[in-house]
Amino acid sequence: MTQLWLIRHGETEWSVEGKHTSHTDIPLTELGRQRAAELGKYLAGTTFLAVLRSPMQRARETCELAGFGDVAVVDEGLREWNYGVYEGRTSREIQAEIPGWGVWKDPIIGGETAEQVGVRADGVIARALAVAHGAAQEEREVSNVALFAHAHVLRILAARWIGLEARGGRLFALGTGNISVLGWEWETKVVLQWNRGIEK
């Protein structure tokens, strides 16, 4: 049985301000770093066959502070949604120019569509399952794979896991430094946990 552990990076200044952040490579805040270290304590009792992470600094810092820096492999598929001209802007700022604008329903000028991010997410899922399939030869009961990445790409990945279109990611809220787990109920792919704060 494969379980994918989705771990959103810790807090950044832009996440606090609600700015769309994809390719802008900014670090964690001090609180974000503290939460990332706490993640390490929370995850210490779980064995991961593989750890994949986004190449961005905020994901790398979270992964390293959680204690997985030495084993993590960069997966380009875990980059955040490319927001194009909307990078660094809040939804409120964009809506002042384009009333009713929403990232899930409107064109992303100079960036990616949700469907394109979905294709990347499908690739990540395939690679994670390939790792788990190899572990099945070792007769493991549960094969855990950790993914350190960003809100939108992880939300889309969750949607794709359960068979929704990429835009189905709009149904999943995901806070900074929080953990979600995807897995199986018999032969059906399911969400086992979602948006779990480690303080809970």
Show which residues each predicted segment covers:
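Short glycine-rich phosphate-binding loop at a beta-alpha junction
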Residues: F48-P55, A135-F148
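Loop-to-helix element that buttresses phosphate recognition and phosphoryl-transfer chemistry
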Residues: W5-T62, I109-D122
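Phosphate-coordination/substrate-recognition cap region in phosphate-metabolizing enzymes
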Residues: E38-A96
